[in-house]
């Protein structure tokens, strides 16, 4: 009698039927059985059974199998047609009495790549990022997202008023709890833990990313932090500085109609300094644009600045200082004024009090610092108010610790990126944090696990006139190879030990439709290197640029 032995963890029945050639039938049975095993769903328990899973401080409110292309994010929304079948688990976590952290964990029914990807939040959070989760699960990852403990729009901070535990959840606890619970749910579903765990997000999500590296180094093997709002308290003091410059008496207010002229003047002064005239300020630190050059000679028009407007512009570029001249936060840089993600959205707004900066800075101080709905930003004192903000909120919200020794010791890799044309968060802040890590840990140690890539011409997390597509969070349109995709480069560094020394970024003819082709490609170089034109060839082709030493 021929006996078919065990295959993997499954023991096949004894083959008791002989064929004429003795054993061929058993071989056929084995082949069929192997096919069944290899094509069966790769999970340990049915998705729906996860509703009874017990986890600390956690209630699982739903566990359901979602058919391919069937998930609809809202009752009136359109289904995510390209998303494969997945197991959706919804849970609420209550680590503190006033906590109510909602998370969702999505796990591919088939084709799991053995990895977990945690996702963060922009602004004040308040919702789960379904589009990012859809991209992750479509690429084979088990993934998780959270509302960080409250419901609301990303520009609303009213939930924080009188709720210090919710501020802690938003600051760091929710992402860590999401990570722990997601890994436990993944283990229960597949019968195996993730082989690798990654976190990727931008803006406030970049702050969350650095918080994970600093406070919970065991959570993730690789972290991708975009445009991090990590010096949260001082960043929002900077917003108040800008608001006072523009709206203190309204004489300095710069209407959106004047922004294109400011942008043109900046480019005229600084665009060609890197040897290429391409509508991009390659490194704004090399630009010494003087707003006084735009002073109106007669009357006023959209093409010039009044004296109070020129002074307001200088203050915004300089950044906040106290009465002793000490810098509180880095100022805005030149080159990010115009465009959909420029100053009319973030700094000047479409009118006084109608900017995103007003929503975030005023919302923070009203609800998390002074806890007074009637507080007026014009009363803020830059000598005393900064300490008040730090004492009240820095412990929960700031992710500025440069000591990443524990993260390095566990083999973690961290990549930070920031657009040089970011009007929301000064890109100089990311350079400052990178430099403090290098100073704290030494350049040799820092180089083993940390990289910073600055993206000329890119606005906040994406968009802008420069090459802005390279696989960063919220921009899945880039190719997936490590040479063109910063997330894939992070994976390659973690899993193969190959550190990224150049990322090719693309500017599409249409940012919304890459099928129209590339308008420009350009290398992103690891800071402090910068891309320099070789002097010959098409300036729209990255092959004609090389990475050379730049300013630290």
Tell where the protein language model's regions lie, with residue ranges.
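Catalytic-loop region of hydrolases
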Residues: 43-115, 130-131, 276-277, 281, ...
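Short beta-strand/loop motif that positions the catalytic acidic residue
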Residues: 416-418
């Amino acid at each position: 009698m021929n006996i078919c032995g065990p295959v993997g963890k499954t023991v096949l029945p004894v083959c008791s039927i002989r064929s004429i050639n003795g054993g061929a039938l058993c071989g056929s049975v084995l082949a069929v059985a192997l096919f069944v095993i290899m094509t069966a769903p790769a999970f340990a328990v049915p998705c729906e059974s996860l509703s009874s899973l017990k986890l600390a401080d956690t209630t699982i409110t739903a566990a359901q199998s979602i058919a391919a292309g069937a998930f609809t994010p809202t009752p009136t929304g359109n289904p995510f047609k390209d998303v494969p079948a997945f197991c959706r688990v919804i849970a609420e976590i209550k680590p503190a009495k006033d906590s109510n952290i909602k998370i969702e964990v999505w796990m591919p029914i088939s084709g799991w790549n053995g990895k977990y990807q945690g996702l963060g939040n922009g602004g004040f959070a308040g919702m789960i990022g379904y589009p990012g989760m859809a991209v992750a699960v479509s690429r084979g990852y088990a993934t998780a997202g959270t509302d960080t403990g409250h419901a609301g729009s990303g520009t609303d901070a009213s939930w924080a008023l009188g709720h210090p535990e919710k501020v802690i959840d938003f600051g760091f606890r929710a992402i860590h709890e999401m990570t722990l619970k997601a890994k436990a749910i993944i283990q229960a579903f597949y019968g195996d833990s993730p082989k690798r765990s990654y976190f990727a997000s931008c803006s406030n999500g970049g702050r969350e990313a650095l918080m994970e590296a600093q406070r919970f180094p065991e959570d993730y093997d690789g972290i991708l932090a975009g445009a991090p709002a990590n010096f949260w308290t001082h960043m929002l003091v900077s917003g108040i500085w800008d608001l006072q410059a523009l709206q203190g008496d309204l004489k300095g207010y710069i209407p959106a109609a004047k922004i294109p002229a400011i942008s043109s003047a900046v480019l005229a002064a600084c665009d060609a300094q890197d040897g290429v005239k391409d509508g991009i300020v390659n490194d704004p630190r090399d630009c010494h644009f003087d707003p006084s050059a735009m002073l109106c000679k007669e009357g006023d028009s959209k093409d010039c600045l009044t004296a109070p407007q020129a002074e307001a512009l200088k203050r915004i570029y300089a950044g906040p200082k106290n009465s002793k001249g000490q810098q509180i936060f880095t100022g805005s840089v030149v080159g990010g004024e115009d465009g959909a993600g420029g100053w009319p959205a973030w700094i000047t707004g479409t009118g006084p009090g109608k900017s995103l900066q007003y929503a975030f800075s005023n919302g923070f101080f009203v609800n998390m610092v002074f806890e007074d709905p009637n507080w007026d930003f014009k009363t803020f004192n830059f000598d005393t108010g900064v300490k008040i903000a730090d004492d009240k909120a820095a412990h929960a919200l700031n992710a500025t610790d440069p000591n990443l020794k524990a993260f390095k010791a566990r083999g973690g890799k961290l990549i930070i990126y920031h657009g040089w044309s970011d009007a929301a968060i000064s890109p100089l802040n990311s350079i400052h944090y990178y430099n403090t890590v290098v100073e704290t840990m030494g350049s040799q140690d820092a180089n083993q696990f940390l990289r910073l890539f600055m993206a000329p011409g890119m606005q906040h997390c994406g968009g802008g006139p420069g090459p802005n597509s390279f696989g960063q969070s919220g921009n899945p349109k880039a190719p997936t190879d490590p040479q063109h995709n910063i997330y894939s480069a992070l994976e390659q560094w973690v899993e193969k030990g190959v550190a990224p020394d150049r990322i090719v970024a693309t500017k599409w003819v249409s940012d919304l439709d890459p099928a129209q082709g590339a308008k420009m490609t350009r290398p992103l170089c690891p800071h402090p290197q910068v891309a320099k034109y070789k002097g010959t060839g098409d300036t729209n082709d990255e092959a004609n640029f090389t990475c050379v030493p730049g300013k630290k």
